[in-house]
């Protein structure tokens, strides 16, 4: 999804909100296209239906890391999971698994982000589990 939404409850946007957004260059000229995208995704809970698999696989990734005693950096209910890896485990995993560094917390701790999607396969999660088992 390409876009962000600002929600005001009770239809009460702050005074001059849209003027300030425009003035600071934060309003896209083609905003209608993004609006159509948001409208479509939130009609009949389509967004939640298509993201269900990604969130379920991310939850399983979290469980796999917890099973192997790896610290979860942030509580994330989304398709992204953040874990704390040692430099040694980071190096070993980065040879076999796609993920990215989110933050170098210290010389001994690296927070890494693992992201799932509609295309994430259970076999890939099983492989992650096997890889971590080998380093336990």
Label for each model-derived stretch:
Residues 1, 5-11, 112-118, 136:
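Electropositive, surface-exposed helix/loop patches at the edges of structured domains
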Residues 1-78, 85:
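Active-site C-terminal subdomain of aminotransferase-like
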């Amino acid at each position: 999804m390409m876009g962000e939404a600002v929600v005001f409850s009770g239809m009460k946007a702050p005074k001059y909100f849209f003027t300030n957004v425009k003035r600071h260059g934060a309003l896209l000229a083609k905003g209608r296209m993004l609006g159509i995208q948001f409208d479509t995704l939130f009609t009949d809970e389509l967004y939640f239906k298509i993201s269900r698999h990604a969130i379920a696989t991310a939850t399983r990734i979290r469980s796999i890391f917890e099973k192997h005693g790896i610290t979860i950096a942030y509580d994330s209910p989304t398709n992204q999971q953040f874990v704390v890896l040692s430099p040694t485990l980071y190096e070993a995993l980065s040879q076999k698994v796609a993920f990215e560094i989110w933050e170098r917390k210290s010389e001994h701790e690296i927070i890494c982000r693992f992201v799932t999607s509609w295309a994430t396969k259970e076999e890939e999660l099983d492989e992650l589990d096997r890889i971590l088992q080998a380093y336990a």
